[in-house]
């Protein structure tokens, strides 16, 4: 399989980054595949230019909740197939995923649920986690190679956020959330960000409300 450069970015609003030179950046950086999360745009709010960028095929899964969620995929390489759901009963209605089959591997671009709003949302998030890992296990058992891009809405270790202690009892850094990432790694997946950035002060988690 030829090498590919895949980028993942939670943009916290597609329209906002579009106004700040997103297209210019993409045309200069030119990754083979770009996965965006939390695009926060309905279908009619997606800038038309993004559907015809030179050298890229674009796919959008706008969030079902207005102004929230949603993912996008920009790819230079044609996919064999593409799905806008994970096939998880009761969890696909928020439109959090794009699944692209490149033949040699499956690419999952996922915006995982946030559990901060309530105990119910935390429970929803943890159930989503469990079902997602079950899905990964089934696909690996079938012989598929998998790349997961996205925002899991959890900081794995203290090195991943600026102020770990104040966040220990807040969703996003709870022991049970962090333990799920441990399980994901135990099941054979690699944290590629930490693979390339093992040093401190290279944070993989940022909360817009707590600013850390």
Segments predicted by a language model, with ranges:
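Structured beta-strand-rich core segments of catalytic domains in phosphoester-bond hydrolases
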Residues: 40, 48-115
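Metal-dependent phosphoesterases centered on the DNase I-like endonuclease/exonuclease/phosphatase
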Residues: 54-57, 130-212
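Internal catalytic-core helix/loop-beta-alpha segment
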Residues: 84, 90, 100, 126-140
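Active-site-proximal beta-strand elements of phosphoester/diester hydrolases
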Residues: 4-12, 104-116, 149
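N-terminal, active-site-proximal structural segment of metallo-dependent hydrolase catalytic domains
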Residues: 1-53, 57, 63-71, 84
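Short catalytic/ligand-binding loop motif for oxyanion handling, primarily in non-cytosolic enzymes
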Residues: 15, 43-45, 67-68, 116-119, ...
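Active-site beta-strand/loop signature of hydrolases that rely on acidic residues for catalysis
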Residues: 10, 26-44, 107, 136-158, ...
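Surface-exposed cleft-lining segments at the edges of enzyme active sites
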Residues: 87-88, 113-129, 165-169
